[in-house]
Amino acid sequence: METILQNVPVGQKVGIAFSGGLDTSAALRWMKNKGALPYAYTANLGQPDEADYDEIPRKAMEYGAEQARLIDCRSQLAGEGIAAIQAGAFHISTGGITYFNTTPLGRAVTGTMLVAAMKEDDVNIWGDGSTFKGNDIERFYRYGLLTNPALKIYKPWLDQTFIDELGGRAEMSAFMTKEGFGYKMSAEKAYSTDSNMLGATHEAKDLEFLNSGIRIVNPIMGVAFWKPEVEVKAEEVSVTFDEGRPVAINGKEIADPVELFLEANRIGGRHGLGMSDQIENRIIEAKSRGIYEAPGMALLHIAYERLVTGIHNEDTIEQYRINGLRLGRLLYQGRWFDPQAIMLRETAQRWVARAVTGTVTLELRRGNDYSILNTESPNLTYAPERLSMEKVEDAPFSPADRIGQLTMRNLDLMDTRDKLAIYAKAGLLSLGTSTALPQLGGKE
């Protein structure tokens, strides 16, 4: 059964994920002219660079949509963002600075909620603006068919007729003008930007070249902290979690997760917190480069992980990190709602996040420069008296206890010496005086 349609489905309802930009505007009008019945669906993801959401459906109707709907996805996006923080679902980092998978989270919400809205309108063909070289074409494919097994996919950008007639932005702009809409292309930037409430992605064009970097980017969620003329004052901020959920910032309870993210974005954005420059592997295994913003996600993640390390033991933390790396990859691949992802996510939410209650106070400076000033939690297993360098009463263990513990290590040390000697005999190790390893003589 054919799932991907390569020609305009004449006379049929076609849902299009409509942003109001040139690409989707031209595609909608073009499909209308070719005989399709376009239905426009716009996701309100709290994009920081979108000024008027209500205007977008009006544009779609003007361009020929049979119906245009604005779907508020912000609560769902906030919920998935918190789940990602609870599970540490982030697998891409450079030098300890994390990419918070904000675009994959947005696609998970958009792909499911827009297709669900289409089902309500008996629309079973879906198109969007993703290209064949990127990740989104596969993410939307997976989430769309997961939500509606009867869904067909039609993307104008995979239709050779569309490409021949409207192959570039100049052609699209001329087409819209010819159709009587006077559409003018926005000023060309040196890169493209995609955003939602959780973060922004800047990529392509000049940013495809590694000798262009963060200095050509104009942040939309924070300040250009690398510019010396931009004043950034140090600021103290506290974040409170209750059973793994962020509930207050600076002592003020914020019940609505959307409002909490917006406040975290405002605070983190004043410092440029959460900006990163990453080289990553796309789903198709080719490398790409992106510059990312995520001020609120970064602030919440820092506070959450501080509590995790103060509350849980080493083995739990290790498993949390290993599972988080795996879950991050699944999220990136468009598998956030697959059973293996749900298993990893709910494990972290149940056995890690549930114990994370407390408040972390930080000082934010420029960019990702910060200090942790205080950590408070009723569940802390950090007890300074256990390892105090001062003399304490009722110490949990004595020098004699440590002597016994060290003596037990002799068993492991003997085995280790024997194995190193075996490796040396096989030529795998050099045990001469010029190496850091001592000269070992097996069981001698």
Curated annotation (Swiss-Prot):
It catalyses: L-citrulline + L-aspartate + ATP = 2-(N(omega)-L-arginino)succinate + AMP + diphosphate + H(+). Its main location: cytoplasm. Gene3D superfamilies: 1.10.287.400, Argininosuccinate synthetase, chain A, domain 2, HUPs. It is found in: Cytoplasm. PROSITE patterns: ARGININOSUCCIN_SYN_1, ARGININOSUCCIN_SYN_2. The keyword Protein biosynthesis does not apply. Pfam families: Arginosuc_syn_C (PF20979), Arginosuc_synth (PF00764). Coiled coil: none annotated. One of its GO terms (molecular function) is ATP binding. CDD domains: ASS. GO terms for cellular component: cytoplasm. L-aspartate binds at T131, N135, D136. ATP binds at A17, F18, S19, G20, G21, L22, D23, T24, S25, A43, G129, T131, D136, D194. One of its GO terms (biological process) is urea cycle. It is an enzyme of class 6 (ligase). L-citrulline binds at Y99, N135, R139, S192, T201, E203, E280. Disulfide bonds: none annotated. Keywords: Amino-acid biosynthesis, Arginine biosynthesis, ATP-binding, Cytoplasm, Ligase, Nucleotide-binding. InterPro entries: Arg_succ_synth_type2_subfam, Arginosuc_syn_C, Arginosuc_syn_N, Arginosuc_synth, Arginosuc_synth_CS, Arginosuc_synth_type_1_subfam, AS_cat/multimer_dom_body, AS_multimer_C_tail. Its EC number is 6.3.4.5. Signal peptide: none annotated. Belongs to the argininosuccinate synthase family. Type 2 subfamily. Homotetramer. PANTHER family: ARGININOSUCCINATE SYNTHASE (PTHR11587:SF2). NCBIfam families: argG, PRK05370.1. This is Argininosuccinate synthase. It comes from Delftia acidovorans (strain DSM 14801 / SPH-1). The lineage of its organism: Bacteria, Pseudomonadati, Pseudomonadota, Betaproteobacteria, Burkholderiales. The gene is argG.
